């Protein structure tokens, strides 16, 4: 499992994300309420921004390459590849 720090508007939370599990699924299992809508990488409701670490978003993403290079990720499809620090609730920053 990878240690993942979620920086949310209501505080900072740390959880272990099992290998192959998305950030959103792991957060929900741990009882954290992150925003989401489609759960399929096709919208930006669940948008987060990686501060440190890396994720696999090969499932296909609504984001373009430039947005991904800036560190934006869709937590519903992003699978940690290392320990992570991620800021959640970032949808407003995209537009």
Swiss-Prot record:
GO terms for biological process: electron transport chain. Its cofactor is [2Fe-2S] cluster. Its main location: plastid. It is found in: Plastid, Chloroplast. Coiled coil: none annotated. Keywords: 2Fe-2S, Chloroplast, Electron transport, Iron, Iron-sulfur, Metal-binding, Plastid, Transport. Ferredoxins are iron-sulfur proteins that transfer electrons in a wide variety of metabolic reactions. Belongs to the 2Fe2S plant-type ferredoxin family. This is Ferredoxin-1. It comes from Equisetum arvense (Field horsetail).
